């Protein structure tokens, strides 16, 4: 609340004594019994237009501003007293209107932005792990007519579920008999025995899990035969990764004979398309 004001009268100039004397008499007679503008409040406003000054005994009435309502039988008026000040209103009888209480959603939480349900505030919603929000994440306490109401319906927290992961050729995954998977449920893929002399290799991630957006964490892997040709290097030799056959992710390391230096990488890996990556290096002088 702004402090009550007292009407201050201007000091006259004496350049025209006759006229100013008469004006001074009139001015003093009105100002000496006058109060300045009435006090202002955060939650109340005048019911009539304010005047520049008020006579002793004049009374002004206040009412709650839009969005506020009376909560106690305190005074809602002030009077210009004989001391040319406004009788103070000790306590404002108006408080902000509030929206109705909204409980925590099942499997979630409702969080007030500043601990109050009064209009202008926000209510934030979050869900527990394993659940996702259906509806608006934030509701606003707004004025609708003379009431404080929420900007929408409270959201709900729905359990995160994934459909069964894809089946793959030449392989399988665990829990293949389950129809619905919950948040963070995981399945692991493996390859079947190959019908020929070379085994199937699992290409991709062997384990995937149900994520928070109800999709799997990655694509299903692939089971296929991956076999790279025997790596041959002239003027050099293989020093690691020996074998008769080279399947997926087989790693070979080379070095050049004395007097030669290597062009390319000394380490190569058999990748998923049955080629060496990077290519087999060369040894040159």
UniProtKB/Swiss-Prot annotation:
Upper lineage: Eukaryota, Metazoa, Chordata, Craniata, Vertebrata
List the protein's name. Answer: Membrane cofactor protein
UniProt entry keywords in alphabetical sequence? Complement pathway, Cytoplasmic vesicle, Disulfide bond, Fertilization, Glycoprotein, Immunity, Innate immunity, Membrane, Repeat, Signal, Sushi
What task does this protein carry out?
Answer: Acts as a cofactor for complement factor I, a serine protease which protects autologous cells against complement-mediated injury by cleaving C3b and C4b deposited on host tissue. May be involved in the fusion of the spermatozoa with the oocyte during fertilization. Also acts as a costimulatory factor for T-cells which induces the differentiation of CD4+ into T-regulatory 1 cells. T-regulatory 1 cells suppress immune responses by secreting interleukin-10, and therefore are thought to prevent autoimmunity.
Q: How does it assemble?
A: Interacts with C3b. Interacts with C4b. Interacts with moesin/MSN.
For the Sushi domain, which residue ranges apply? 33-96, 97-159, 160-225, 226-285
Q: Which residues cross the membrane?
A: none
Membrane topology annotation: Single-pass type I membrane protein
Question: Which residues bear sugar attachments?
Answer: 40, 47, 114
Q: List the disulfide bonds.
A: 35-80, 64-94, 99-141, 127-157, 162-210, 191-223, 228-270, 256-283
- Span of the secretion signal? 1-32
Q: Which Pfam families match?
A: Sushi
CDD domains hit by this protein:
CCP
Q: Which organism is it from?
A: Saguinus mystax (Moustached tamarin)
Any Gene Ontology CC annotation: inner acrosomal membrane
Which GO biological-process labels does this protein carry? Answer: complement activation, classical pathway; innate immune response; single fertilization
Q: Where in the cell is it found?
A: Cytoplasmic vesicle, Secretory vesicle, Acrosome inner membrane
Superkingdom = Eukaryota
Q: What is known of its domains?
A: Sushi domains 3 and 4 are the most important for interaction with C3b and C4b.
Tagged with keyword Zinc-finger: no
């Amino acid at each position: 609340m702004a402090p009550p004001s007292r009407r201050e009268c201007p000091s006259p100039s004496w350049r025209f004594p006759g006229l100013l004397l008469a004006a001074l008499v009139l001015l003093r007679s009105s100002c000496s019994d006058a109060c300045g503008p009435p006090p202002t409040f955060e939650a109340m406003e005048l019911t009539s237009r304010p005047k520049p000054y008020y006579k002793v005994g004049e009374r002004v009435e206040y009412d709650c501003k839009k969005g506020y309502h009376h909560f106690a039988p305190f005074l809602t008026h002030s009077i210009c007293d004989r001391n040319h000040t406004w009788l103070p209103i000790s306590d404002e009888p108006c408080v902000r209107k509030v929206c109705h209480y909204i409980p925590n959603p099942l499997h979630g939480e409702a969080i007030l932005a500043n601990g109050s349900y009064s209009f202008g505030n926000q209510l934030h919603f979050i869900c527990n792990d394993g659940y996702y929000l259906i509806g608006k994440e934030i509701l606003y306490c707004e004025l609708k007519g003379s009431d404080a109401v929420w900007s929408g319906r409270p959201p709900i927290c729905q359990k995160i579920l994934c459909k069964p992961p894809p089946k793959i050729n030449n392989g399988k995954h665990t829990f293949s008999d389950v129809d619905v998977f919950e948040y963070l449920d995981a399945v692991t893929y493996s390859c079947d025995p190959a019908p020929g002399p070379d085994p199937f290799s699992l290409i991709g991630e062997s384990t995937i899990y149900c994520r928070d957006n109800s999709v799997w964490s990655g694509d299903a892997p692939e089971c296929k035969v991956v076999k790279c040709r025997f790596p041959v290097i002239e003027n050099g030799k293989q020093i690691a990764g020996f074998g008769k056959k080279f399947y997926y992710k087989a790693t070979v390391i080379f070095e050049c004979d004395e007097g030669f230096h290597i062009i390319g990488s000394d380490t190569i890996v058999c990748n998923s398309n049955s080629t060496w990556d990077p290519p087999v290096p060369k040894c040159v002088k």
